Amino acid sequence: MNAPRLTDTTLRDGSHALAHTFTRQQVRDIVRALDRAGVPVIEVTHGDGLAGSSLQYGFSRVPDLDLIAEARETAERARIAALLLPGIGTRRELRAAVERGVQVLRIATQCTEADISEEHFKMAKDMGLETVGFLMMSHMRPPEFLAEQARLMESYGADCVYVVDSAGAMLPHDAAARVQALKAALTVQVGFHAHNNLGLGIGNTLAALEAGADQIDGCLRGLGAGAGNAATEVLAAVLDRLGINPGLDVLALMDAAEYVVAPIMPFQPFPDRDAITIGYAGVYSTFLLHARRIGEQLGVDPRAILIELGRRQTVAGQEDWILDVALELVRQQQTTPV
Protein backbone atom coordinates (compact mmCIF):
# COMPACT_ATOMS: atom_id res chain seq x y z
CA MET A 1 0.00 0.00 0.00
CA ASN A 2 1.14 3.51 -0.80
CA ALA A 3 0.32 6.62 1.21
CA PRO A 4 -2.99 7.95 -0.18
CA ARG A 5 -4.16 11.50 -0.60
CA LEU A 6 -6.97 12.25 1.83
CA THR A 7 -9.82 14.63 1.09
CA ASP A 8 -11.85 15.75 4.08
CA THR A 9 -15.51 16.27 3.23
CA THR A 10 -16.86 17.32 6.63
CA LEU A 11 -18.01 20.59 5.07
CA ARG A 12 -19.83 18.84 2.21
CA ASP A 13 -21.04 15.35 3.20
CA GLY A 14 -21.34 16.57 6.78
CA SER A 15 -23.71 19.25 5.54
CA HIS A 16 -26.39 16.56 5.14
CA ALA A 17 -26.26 15.69 8.83
CA LEU A 18 -26.49 19.36 9.83
CA ALA A 19 -29.35 20.05 7.39
CA HIS A 20 -27.01 22.40 5.48
CA THR A 21 -26.69 24.87 8.35
CA PHE A 22 -22.93 25.47 8.48
CA THR A 23 -22.06 29.06 9.39
CA ARG A 24 -19.14 31.13 8.16
CA GLN A 25 -17.42 30.86 11.53
CA GLN A 26 -17.83 27.09 11.62
CA VAL A 27 -16.30 26.82 8.16
CA ARG A 28 -13.36 28.97 9.21
CA ASP A 29 -12.80 26.93 12.37
CA ILE A 30 -12.99 23.55 10.61
CA VAL A 31 -10.82 24.59 7.66
CA ARG A 32 -8.21 26.08 9.98
CA ALA A 33 -8.06 22.88 12.05
CA LEU A 34 -7.84 20.61 9.01
CA ASP A 35 -5.27 22.81 7.30
CA ARG A 36 -3.01 22.90 10.34
CA ALA A 37 -3.30 19.10 10.66
CA GLY A 38 -1.96 18.61 7.16
CA VAL A 39 -5.12 17.64 5.28
CA PRO A 40 -4.33 18.43 1.63
CA VAL A 41 -7.86 18.81 0.20
CA ILE A 42 -11.00 20.15 1.90
CA GLU A 43 -14.38 19.88 0.18
CA VAL A 44 -16.90 22.68 0.81
CA THR A 45 -20.42 22.83 -0.65
CA HIS A 46 -24.03 22.02 0.03
CA GLY A 47 -24.36 18.28 0.56
CA ASP A 48 -25.77 17.91 -2.96
CA GLY A 49 -23.11 20.09 -4.49
CA LEU A 50 -23.10 23.48 -6.15
CA ALA A 51 -26.65 24.85 -6.51
CA GLY A 52 -27.94 22.10 -4.24
CA SER A 53 -29.60 24.64 -1.95
CA SER A 54 -33.24 24.22 -2.96
CA LEU A 55 -36.66 23.05 -1.85
CA GLN A 56 -35.86 19.58 -3.22
CA TYR A 57 -32.61 19.08 -1.31
CA GLY A 58 -32.86 21.58 1.53
CA PHE A 59 -31.83 25.20 1.72
CA SER A 60 -28.40 26.26 2.98
CA ARG A 61 -28.25 28.70 5.86
CA VAL A 62 -25.33 30.46 4.17
CA PRO A 63 -24.85 30.41 0.38
CA ASP A 64 -22.28 27.89 -0.85
CA LEU A 65 -20.24 30.52 -2.61
CA ASP A 66 -19.79 32.48 0.61
CA LEU A 67 -18.65 29.37 2.47
CA ILE A 68 -16.21 28.52 -0.33
CA ALA A 69 -14.76 32.03 -0.11
CA GLU A 70 -14.36 31.70 3.66
CA ALA A 71 -12.62 28.36 3.22
CA ARG A 72 -10.21 29.64 0.59
CA GLU A 73 -9.33 32.71 2.63
CA THR A 74 -8.68 30.55 5.71
CA ALA A 75 -6.66 27.71 4.19
CA GLU A 76 -2.93 28.32 4.05
CA ARG A 77 -1.88 25.01 2.44
CA ALA A 78 -4.95 22.91 1.72
CA ARG A 79 -6.68 23.04 -1.64
CA ILE A 80 -10.42 23.75 -1.68
CA ALA A 81 -12.70 21.35 -3.53
CA ALA A 82 -16.35 21.52 -4.51
CA LEU A 83 -18.85 18.89 -5.60
CA LEU A 84 -20.98 19.30 -8.72
CA LEU A 85 -23.81 17.04 -9.86
CA PRO A 86 -24.72 17.51 -13.53
CA GLY A 87 -28.36 18.49 -13.65
CA ILE A 88 -28.09 20.43 -10.39
CA GLY A 89 -24.96 22.54 -10.74
CA THR A 90 -24.50 24.51 -13.96
CA ARG A 91 -21.75 26.43 -15.72
CA ARG A 92 -22.84 29.59 -13.94
CA GLU A 93 -22.32 28.08 -10.48
CA LEU A 94 -19.02 26.53 -11.53
CA ARG A 95 -17.64 29.83 -12.79
CA ALA A 96 -18.76 31.57 -9.62
CA ALA A 97 -17.19 28.85 -7.46
CA VAL A 98 -13.87 29.21 -9.26
CA GLU A 99 -14.01 32.96 -8.75
CA ARG A 100 -14.50 32.33 -5.03
CA GLY A 101 -11.50 30.01 -4.84
CA VAL A 102 -12.36 26.42 -5.82
CA GLN A 103 -9.29 24.55 -7.07
CA VAL A 104 -10.56 20.96 -7.30
CA LEU A 105 -13.89 20.00 -8.85
CA ARG A 106 -15.46 16.65 -7.99
CA ILE A 107 -18.09 15.75 -10.60
CA ALA A 108 -20.62 13.16 -9.43
CA THR A 109 -22.98 11.07 -11.55
CA GLN A 110 -24.91 7.89 -10.97
CA CYS A 111 -22.63 4.96 -11.71
CA THR A 112 -24.60 4.29 -14.91
CA GLU A 113 -24.52 7.86 -16.24
CA ALA A 114 -20.89 8.91 -16.64
CA ASP A 115 -21.71 10.12 -20.15
CA ILE A 116 -23.63 13.13 -18.81
CA SER A 117 -20.44 14.55 -17.26
CA GLU A 118 -18.46 15.17 -20.46
CA GLU A 119 -19.07 18.89 -20.85
CA HIS A 120 -18.57 19.51 -17.13
CA PHE A 121 -15.13 17.86 -17.14
CA LYS A 122 -14.09 19.73 -20.26
CA MET A 123 -15.21 23.05 -18.87
CA ALA A 124 -13.43 22.40 -15.57
CA LYS A 125 -10.21 21.48 -17.37
CA ASP A 126 -10.48 24.60 -19.53
CA MET A 127 -10.66 26.59 -16.29
CA GLY A 128 -7.48 24.95 -15.02
CA LEU A 129 -9.07 22.85 -12.28
CA GLU A 130 -8.02 19.48 -10.98
CA THR A 131 -10.93 17.15 -11.75
CA VAL A 132 -12.23 14.11 -9.92
CA GLY A 133 -15.02 11.80 -11.10
CA PHE A 134 -17.49 10.33 -8.63
CA LEU A 135 -19.41 7.17 -9.61
CA MET A 136 -22.23 7.27 -7.06
CA MET A 137 -24.08 4.18 -5.85
CA SER A 138 -21.22 2.02 -7.11
CA HIS A 139 -22.58 -1.03 -5.30
CA MET A 140 -25.40 -1.26 -7.85
CA ARG A 141 -23.23 -2.39 -10.76
CA PRO A 142 -20.47 -5.02 -11.15
CA PRO A 143 -16.79 -4.03 -11.29
CA GLU A 144 -16.46 -4.48 -15.05
CA PHE A 145 -19.36 -2.13 -15.72
CA LEU A 146 -17.92 0.51 -13.37
CA ALA A 147 -14.58 0.28 -15.15
CA GLU A 148 -16.29 1.12 -18.45
CA GLN A 149 -17.96 4.14 -16.89
CA ALA A 150 -14.68 5.22 -15.30
CA ARG A 151 -12.95 5.03 -18.68
CA LEU A 152 -15.50 7.51 -20.00
CA MET A 153 -14.69 9.95 -17.20
CA GLU A 154 -10.97 9.51 -17.86
CA SER A 155 -11.53 10.25 -21.56
CA TYR A 156 -13.37 13.45 -20.60
CA GLY A 157 -10.42 14.67 -18.54
CA ALA A 158 -10.79 13.24 -15.02
CA ASP A 159 -7.52 13.20 -13.07
CA CYS A 160 -8.97 10.60 -10.69
CA VAL A 161 -12.13 8.48 -10.62
CA TYR A 162 -13.75 7.39 -7.36
CA VAL A 163 -15.67 4.28 -6.45
CA VAL A 164 -18.41 5.82 -4.28
CA ASP A 165 -20.32 3.69 -1.78
CA SER A 166 -23.16 6.19 -1.47
CA ALA A 167 -25.41 3.69 0.31
CA GLY A 168 -22.77 2.28 2.64
CA ALA A 169 -23.86 -1.07 1.22
CA MET A 170 -20.51 -2.57 0.25
CA LEU A 171 -18.61 -5.28 2.05
CA PRO A 172 -14.79 -5.20 1.95
CA HIS A 173 -14.54 -7.60 -0.98
CA ASP A 174 -16.99 -5.40 -2.92
CA ALA A 175 -14.84 -2.33 -2.40
CA ALA A 176 -11.64 -4.16 -3.30
CA ALA A 177 -13.05 -5.70 -6.48
CA ARG A 178 -14.29 -2.36 -7.78
CA VAL A 179 -11.07 -0.52 -7.03
CA GLN A 180 -9.05 -3.32 -8.66
CA ALA A 181 -11.21 -3.12 -11.78
CA LEU A 182 -10.67 0.63 -12.08
CA LYS A 183 -6.93 0.33 -11.42
CA ALA A 184 -6.66 -2.21 -14.23
CA ALA A 185 -8.69 -0.07 -16.65
CA LEU A 186 -7.37 3.46 -16.03
CA THR A 187 -4.13 5.36 -16.33
CA VAL A 188 -5.31 8.03 -13.87
CA GLN A 189 -5.67 7.69 -10.11
CA VAL A 190 -8.49 5.80 -8.38
CA GLY A 191 -10.27 6.88 -5.20
CA PHE A 192 -12.72 5.41 -2.70
CA HIS A 193 -15.49 7.16 -0.72
CA ALA A 194 -17.07 5.19 2.13
CA HIS A 195 -20.23 5.43 4.21
CA ASN A 196 -20.67 3.66 7.52
CA ASN A 197 -24.21 2.30 7.35
CA LEU A 198 -23.05 -1.28 7.90
CA GLY A 199 -20.23 -0.20 10.20
CA LEU A 200 -17.61 -0.78 7.49
CA GLY A 201 -16.47 2.73 6.61
CA ILE A 202 -12.91 2.19 7.83
CA GLY A 203 -12.79 -1.49 6.84
CA ASN A 204 -13.92 -0.81 3.29
CA THR A 205 -11.44 2.05 2.96
CA LEU A 206 -8.64 -0.27 4.05
CA ALA A 207 -9.78 -2.88 1.54
CA ALA A 208 -9.75 -0.19 -1.15
CA LEU A 209 -6.22 0.84 -0.16
CA GLU A 210 -5.04 -2.76 -0.28
CA ALA A 211 -6.53 -2.95 -3.78
CA GLY A 212 -4.50 0.07 -4.84
CA ALA A 213 -6.65 3.15 -4.17
CA ASP A 214 -4.69 6.39 -4.51
CA GLN A 215 -7.18 8.73 -2.85
CA ILE A 216 -9.63 8.33 0.03
CA ASP A 217 -12.22 10.47 1.81
CA GLY A 218 -13.11 11.09 5.41
CA CYS A 219 -15.14 13.39 7.67
CA LEU A 220 -14.19 14.57 11.13
CA ARG A 221 -16.09 12.58 13.74
CA GLY A 222 -17.58 10.64 10.82
CA LEU A 223 -20.02 13.52 10.25
CA GLY A 224 -21.92 12.69 7.08
CA ALA A 225 -25.07 11.32 5.51
CA GLY A 226 -26.66 8.13 6.84
CA ALA A 227 -24.46 6.61 9.55
CA GLY A 228 -21.72 8.97 8.46
CA ASN A 229 -18.44 8.48 6.66
CA ALA A 230 -15.08 7.01 7.55
CA ALA A 231 -13.82 9.29 10.32
CA THR A 232 -10.86 11.40 9.22
CA GLU A 233 -9.14 11.17 12.59
CA VAL A 234 -9.50 7.38 12.66
CA LEU A 235 -8.20 7.08 9.10
CA ALA A 236 -5.19 9.17 10.08
CA ALA A 237 -4.44 6.92 13.06
CA VAL A 238 -4.84 3.77 10.98
CA LEU A 239 -2.65 5.08 8.15
CA ASP A 240 0.00 6.02 10.68
CA ARG A 241 -0.10 2.55 12.22
CA LEU A 242 0.30 1.06 8.75
CA GLY A 243 3.33 3.22 8.05
CA ILE A 244 1.67 5.07 5.17
CA ASN A 245 0.75 8.36 6.86
CA PRO A 246 0.73 10.98 4.06
CA GLY A 247 1.69 13.78 6.44
CA LEU A 248 -1.36 14.02 8.68
CA ASP A 249 -1.05 15.17 12.30
CA VAL A 250 -3.00 12.42 14.05
CA LEU A 251 -3.35 14.15 17.41
CA ALA A 252 -4.38 17.45 15.83
CA LEU A 253 -7.12 15.67 13.88
CA MET A 254 -8.34 13.99 17.07
CA ASP A 255 -8.55 17.42 18.68
CA ALA A 256 -10.35 18.88 15.66
CA ALA A 257 -12.95 16.14 15.83
CA GLU A 258 -13.39 16.44 19.59
CA TYR A 259 -13.28 20.19 20.12
CA VAL A 260 -14.27 21.77 16.80
CA VAL A 261 -16.79 19.42 15.18
CA ALA A 262 -18.37 17.46 18.04
CA PRO A 263 -19.80 20.57 19.78
CA ILE A 264 -21.78 21.59 16.68
CA MET A 265 -23.16 18.14 15.86
CA PRO A 266 -26.89 17.63 16.51
CA PHE A 267 -26.23 13.89 16.83
CA GLN A 268 -23.44 11.38 16.33
CA PRO A 269 -23.95 9.47 13.07
CA PHE A 270 -24.06 5.80 13.97
CA PRO A 271 -25.33 2.55 12.43
CA ASP A 272 -28.66 2.59 14.25
CA ARG A 273 -31.62 0.60 12.94
CA ASP A 274 -32.59 3.12 10.27
CA ALA A 275 -29.03 3.66 9.06
CA ILE A 276 -28.41 -0.08 8.94
CA THR A 277 -31.52 -0.35 6.80
CA ILE A 278 -29.97 2.14 4.35
CA GLY A 279 -26.93 -0.10 3.88
CA TYR A 280 -28.95 -3.30 3.96
CA ALA A 281 -31.40 -2.06 1.33
CA GLY A 282 -28.76 -0.24 -0.72
CA VAL A 283 -30.43 3.17 -0.57
CA TYR A 284 -28.76 6.55 -1.00
CA SER A 285 -27.49 7.65 2.43
CA THR A 286 -29.02 11.12 2.27
CA PHE A 287 -32.50 9.59 2.26
CA LEU A 288 -32.20 8.73 5.96
CA LEU A 289 -33.30 12.01 7.56
CA HIS A 290 -36.00 12.57 4.94
CA ALA A 291 -37.45 9.10 5.57
CA ARG A 292 -37.39 9.65 9.34
CA ARG A 293 -39.15 13.00 9.10
CA ILE A 294 -41.82 11.83 6.66
CA GLY A 295 -42.28 8.56 8.53
CA GLU A 296 -42.88 10.45 11.77
CA GLN A 297 -45.37 12.79 10.10
CA LEU A 298 -47.37 9.96 8.51
CA GLY A 299 -46.95 7.27 11.15
CA VAL A 300 -44.91 4.95 8.93
CA ASP A 301 -41.83 2.98 10.00
CA PRO A 302 -38.87 4.67 8.21
CA ARG A 303 -37.38 1.24 7.61
CA ALA A 304 -40.40 0.23 5.55
CA ILE A 305 -39.95 3.35 3.44
CA LEU A 306 -36.24 2.71 2.95
CA ILE A 307 -36.67 -0.96 2.06
CA GLU A 308 -39.27 -0.11 -0.57
CA LEU A 309 -37.01 2.61 -1.97
CA GLY A 310 -34.24 0.04 -2.20
CA ARG A 311 -36.55 -2.38 -3.99
CA ARG A 312 -37.29 0.34 -6.53
CA GLN A 313 -33.56 1.07 -6.90
CA THR A 314 -33.96 4.77 -6.25
CA VAL A 315 -30.92 6.99 -6.64
CA ALA A 316 -29.79 10.50 -5.75
CA GLY A 317 -32.14 13.12 -7.10
CA GLN A 318 -35.25 11.05 -6.45
CA GLU A 319 -35.94 12.39 -2.97
CA ASP A 320 -39.51 13.13 -4.05
CA TRP A 321 -40.08 9.36 -4.19
CA ILE A 322 -39.75 9.18 -0.41
CA LEU A 323 -43.07 10.94 0.15
CA ASP A 324 -44.72 8.95 -2.65
CA VAL A 325 -43.62 5.65 -1.11
CA ALA A 326 -44.68 6.73 2.38
CA LEU A 327 -48.15 7.72 1.17
CA GLU A 328 -48.49 4.41 -0.64
CA LEU A 329 -47.57 2.56 2.55
CA VAL A 330 -50.19 4.58 4.46
CA ARG A 331 -52.83 3.59 1.93
CA GLN A 332 -51.80 -0.05 2.26
CA GLN A 333 -52.12 0.18 6.04
CA GLN A 334 -55.58 1.71 5.74
CA THR A 335 -56.84 -1.04 3.41
CA THR A 336 -55.31 -3.95 5.32
CA PRO A 337 -57.92 -5.71 7.51
CA VAL A 338 -57.16 -5.61 11.22
Swiss-Prot record:
It holds the Pfam family HMGL-like. GO terms for biological process: catabolic process; L-leucine biosynthetic process. GO terms for molecular function: 2-isopropylmalate synthase activity; 4-hydroxy-2-oxovalerate aldolase activity; manganese ion binding. It catalyses: (S)-4-hydroxy-2-oxopentanoate = acetaldehyde + pyruvate. Mn(2+) binds at D13, H193, H195. Belongs to the 4-hydroxy-2-oxovalerate aldolase family. This is 4-hydroxy-2-oxovalerate aldolase. The lineage of its organism: Bacteria, Bacillati, Chloroflexota, Chloroflexia, Chloroflexales.
